């Protein structure tokens, strides 16, 4: 970002994406914070999933973080429509519902996050981070303190019917719970 000079940042409530009044295409990157949210076992509405799917199919780049995403979309008993979105667009599989002992997350050797230590659950408590595993060409970028559990995956390539390469970084914990003073490289 520093090399790009001026950076324009916009924020919008997910409900605006859901009702169609805000469109994701045209943005270089979308950062989607889910936090601890899972209302009635719904993390992404059908309209939100459709918007994200279209954005990634068109070569979009998505950073998404949250502790209930994998639990909601990827566990046994998840809605049949959720698993293909989770596997094919977030490029992950659900491993387990973790605990607060999973912090900090550390960068996977050989990944762009190598050497990073990222304590989470600091700004607000995070008691159930999702352990996830990469699928569909994704790779692990962050590991939890309780190994072999993984907390971050990344993928670059095409999605679905798309012909333009896009990218996703998916974190199984709320990134916004990390305190800057606890991060180290």
Where are the regions a protein language model picked out?
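A glycine-centered loop/beta-turn motif at secondary-structure junctions
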Residues: 26, 30, 57-65, 121-185
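Alpha-helical scaffolding within the catalytic cores
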Residues: 14-22, 44-51, 148-157
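Short, solvent-exposed polar/charged micro-motifs at secondary-structure junctions
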Residues: 19-24, 104-115, 148-154, 181
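Extended interaction regions within the primary functional domain
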Residues: 1-5, 78-83, 119, 123, ...
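Aromatic-Pro/Gly-enriched surface loop or interdomain linker
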Residues: 1-36, 161-162, 177-181
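Structural alpha-beta junctions
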Residues: 2-11, 54-61, 167
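Short linear motifs in intrinsically disordered/low-complexity regions
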Residues: 15, 20, 88, 97-98, ...
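A glycine-rich, often tryptophan-bearing local segment used as a flexible ligand/cofactor-contacting loop or short
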Residues: 37-122, 134-138, 146
